[in-house]
């Protein structure tokens, strides 16, 4: 069964976009995944096909209408039963690699792409929608965020990356940033590949990579480092309690 991506968007021509190239493109051609974008505007009910209105209480910008969004969501859920519904919004929960793996292991996702000032909040009360953020940044629309999320999922689908272990040592997979990589030439602009990587000693290489990953995480992502330290401490604490019992 292929992974089904269902973007709900005002700009369906943006899909598959860059996902029609490289690994994701080959996977699309082979049927590993498929893309079925839905035009939100098709569910407007007036002759002008209006999808947005001014914000209640005043303020800048326009807000996507709950009734129109509900029509698009209901259509997608009926056409693709069992798919989770996600909304791309900076107000959402930051996505994690663990959540990406969960999505990639499932049948696909319906992804609601925002525009303007965002969504009428009532849509989240009325429909089962997971609000997701790709980071502390603001984009002009949810389509680019949806493409990022889909790329993260598609590369994890069976056969897409070739070797099944290709994604195992990447950043975030073990709670750390990934270790640095090098390739030929051995010396470039006076900078030489670390000797340990040329030693052929796999145990030393593994230890060096672990140390480099930990150091990069500690310096660049103290939030991840703190969680990593906490995760290492919890099993040890549990073992001590078991011994005491």
Swiss-Prot record:
Residues that, per the record, bind S-adenosyl-L-methionine: 114
UniProt signal peptide: none
Catalytic activity: guanosine(37) in tRNA + S-adenosyl-L-methionine = N(1)-methylguanosine(37) in tRNA + S-adenosyl-L-homocysteine + H(+)
A UniProt-annotated Pfam family: tRNA_m1G_MT
Subcellular location: Cytoplasm
Domain of life: Bacteria
Broad EC category: transferase
Family: Belongs to the RNA methyltransferase TrmD family.
NCBIfam families on file: PRK00026.1, trmD
PANTHER family found in the cross-reference section: TRNA (GUANINE-N(1)-)-METHYLTRANSFERASE (PTHR46417:SF1)
Protein name listed in UniProt: tRNA (guanine-N(1)-)-methyltransferase
Origin species: Sphingopyxis alaskensis (strain DSM 13593 / LMG 18877 / RB2256)
